[in-house]
């Protein structure tokens, strides 16, 4: 695995976390809308690394504030963890470039 693929995997994780955060924010913003059905995010591991996301609509009507608050916290923590990996990969690549010069 090279530095580029590590960065790409971390970036896909950050994008997945952002999608989850957007979805839960959408759910909270629309919870008082009549007939509203929650959005749910399905994450799938990709061959070669990384993650993809799919938005679906819940079969159940109505809000689930507790679920959305937990989803927001998970998205935040996932984003921060992937950001740390991305930064570390960037620092390692920079150190390798300095050695080659």
Locate predicted features.
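Amphipathic alpha-helical polymerization modules
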Residues: 1-101
